[in-house]
């Protein structure tokens, strides 16, 4: 499933920089909006609506500061009948972090469950250690606030996001049982969920 962009839920896709410039694939998947999260992110195609976030794939990069604008961009796109591709360079770390933050906001699932759901459709994803810390911090301190903000700012969601993520979790469990993802490549450093203590991110004292 690593070839090309992958559908996560209705109106939300995850991919790499090549996917963001592939007109055939963009058209085939009905993409109208592109959220670019990479070094020197900039609009490329004139007929797309962009949100460009300049961010490095480094543990010291503060990506959570961009969660709210990213969530707004994705949600408004979907509510207006569009489809959003979120991408970074490889479609593994930065873009996955943003997608997970969005899924956390539109469902009741935590960051690890949302990341697992994404792995059901794109098995090799894996936010770096710093981004996982930021997702944990988001879950601990901000996600309920963002959920309330989303409910207050927009009409009732017509989407079945909770059910779709639940279905992805079931799919991932089935994949595990079938042994489809028990190869060493999938368990590589890039796709690993790191063991984080509950207050690990806060204890680091970082102002990323």
Curated annotation (Swiss-Prot):
Keywords: Cytoplasm, Hydrolase, Nucleus, Protein phosphatase. Transmembrane segments: none annotated. Residues 4-144 form the Tyrosine-protein phosphatase domain. It is found in: Cytoplasm; Nucleus. Pfam families: DSPc. GO terms for biological process: signal transduction. This is Dual specificity protein phosphatase 22-A. The gene is dusp22a.
């Amino acid at each position: 499933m690593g070839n090309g962009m992958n559908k996560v839920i209705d109106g939300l896709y995850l991919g790499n920089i090549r996917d963001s410039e592939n007109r055939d694939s963009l058209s085939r998947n009905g993409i109208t909006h592109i959220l670019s999260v990479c070094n020197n992110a900039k609009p490329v195609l004139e007929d797309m609506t962009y949100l460009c976030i300049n961010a490095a794939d480094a543990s010291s990069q503060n990506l959570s500061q961009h969660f709210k604008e990213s969530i707004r961009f994705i949600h408004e796109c979907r509510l207006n009948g569009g489809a959003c591709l979120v991408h970074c360079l490889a479609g593994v770390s930065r873009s996955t972090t943003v997608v997970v933050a969005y899924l956390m906001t539109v469902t009741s699932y935590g960051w690890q469950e949302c990341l697992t759901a994404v792995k059901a459709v794109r098995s090799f994803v894996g936010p770096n250690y710093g981004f996982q810390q930021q997702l944990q911090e988001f879950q601990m301190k901000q996600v309920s606030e963002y959920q309330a903000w989303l409910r207050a700012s927009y009409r009732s969601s017509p989407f079945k996001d909770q059910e779709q993520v639940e279905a992805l979790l079931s799919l991932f469990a089935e994949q595990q049982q079938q042994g489809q993802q028990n190869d060493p490549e999938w368990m590589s450093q890039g796709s690993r969920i790191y063991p984080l203590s509950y207050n690990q991110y806060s204890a680091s004292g970082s102002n990323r």
